[in-house]
């Protein structure tokens, strides 16, 4: 049975999220990913993906880890915002300073597969192989950051019907693959418990830029507009607002300008909880 099937559906008035703290819980998810240079990956120019190597797209993606992320860290430091790092475990080996600096800032870390090569997507693999992949990623992150990995986001949000049960069995507390609600909700697992913490494909730079084709300014406007609606609704019933970002997209200067504007708008409001997936999970488990 799917983990999502038969999960309780709530009317908005029936759920509260940190209502004594804020009207909106803003969760910036920062996807920090590694793409092997000999395998096609997310591309700004798809026409060269078949080349090996593909310096055009590999270099564009690598800009995120070399430059874009640090621009984002500086901004988030300025406004007191912590990220929830969706981490490919290969980053630990390839870019150890990234893990050191974000961990120093007490950012949250959730598992996001080995790397973002299609060969490491979870869809279609057997349970034994999936358990090996998930378990290996969790152990690598826990060793690198020195604490339990509470959350998981499957690479490209690809998972199997076994994924939720494997995660719960391995001690993971929340999953971000389902984008179905403005609030956390429980998922059905065979043993233990697993919570769905909000994630989004709406306020997500990859589909916004690569699939929908919005402008940099429009993406900033989308963040502001989403916040304004949820902030108004949060006066009666607090909401979660995930913002899902990739360093090689919004870390580019022309896009970063509008991300900075949007984050400044959020930070200018009172009764806003700038938080992480870990903290939302902890709050929900304590108060549900």
Show where each model-derived region lies.
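Short, local alpha-helical segments
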Residues: 206-210, 242-249
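Catalytic alpha-helical scaffold of carbohydrate-active enzymes acting on polysaccharides/glycoconjugates
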Residues: 2-151, 156-195, 220-243, 251-288
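Positively charged, amphipathic and often flexible ligand-engagement surfaces
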Residues: 184, 196-218, 238
